[in-house]
Amino acid sequence: MRDFVEHNPWHFVEENSFIAGSFAWAGVDYLGESSPWPAKGWCSCPFDMTLKERPQAVFYHPAWKPEEDYLKLVVRDNCFDQAVGTDHWQYPPMADTWDLPYTDSRCVEVRCYTTCDSVQFFFPMWSNPQLPLKPRRTADYRDNCITIQLPARQGKVLAIGYKDGKEVMRDSLVNHGPVAGLRLEADRTTLSPVAKDYAPATAFGTVSHVRLRLIDKEGRTQQMQPRTFRVETEGPIRLLGVETGDMRRKESWRTTELKTYFGEGLVRLQSTTATGTARLLIYVEGFDKPFIQEITIKEH
């Protein structure tokens, strides 16, 4: 709130029976309200402009659905290159990665948001791994968030959540290898052609969102080694835009070339009035050949 008290506005709903609910302004980042420059819009929302959920948004999972099993590890540290947001609307920098830039074993804050009764942490990189870290009771912490300070050493942080003494969930933070490839995920690989009269009734099913992720040789997302990528299209398809979620970008919103942001990017495509097979080609820094996603356009 305005006094910089760590008290999420949702708690006012929980604590006061006469409040029916609340609205989160806003749910998704948007352009046009700098917060602050060089951000070109509002960048403190649970979802960025690619509709990727921010690590800061994990607060809402146990808050809004306490009956569901949930456990998520994130690191809170100022090493993460994130837009800061405006004053008391901003979140502290967080990311769900253990690929940190430190080599001196300094402590960082690990947060575990959970609906479990207790969580046991395993930290084999500790100087005395034979001594297990004692279980933490969720009730002893605020916001369903267990915090622990751990040295930023190479390896793995494992959290096991328990309910009524039984294991129900696990999550981990591990060090990833260098970028070895790119994974493409399209929400639609088959589209309808746009009507020749551009009738709005036929607009459904004409847009595909293709998310790209830098991966290591194990297929895990590498968030901390950004690469420049360039987009080209072939066939009956048109490029609507390229986005990464970083509101501080200096490039035009019509650019075909950006740098990944925490290992990811998003390409928006739309069919034309023609049918056939279209191809999205993504050229990534460090790779000789493009990564290709095919999109089929046909009448339905």
Model-derived segments and spans:
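Conserved structural position at the C-terminal beta-strand
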Residues: 161, 214, 282-284
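Short beta-strand elements
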Residues: 169-178, 290-300
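Short aromatic-acidic-glycine turn motif
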Residues: 180-183, 232-248
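Exposed beta-strand face motif in extracellular beta-rich ectodomains
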Residues: 153-157, 208, 274-278
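Short, hydrophobic beta-strand segments
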Residues: 146-152, 253-273
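Substrate-binding clefts and catalytic carboxylate motifs of secreted carbohydrate-active enzymes
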Residues: 1-199, 204, 217-221
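Solvent-exposed serine/threonine-rich low-complexity stretches and specific carbohydrate-binding patches
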Residues: 129-140, 240-257
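Short, solvent-exposed loop/turn segments enriched in Ser/Thr/Gly
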Residues: 204-210
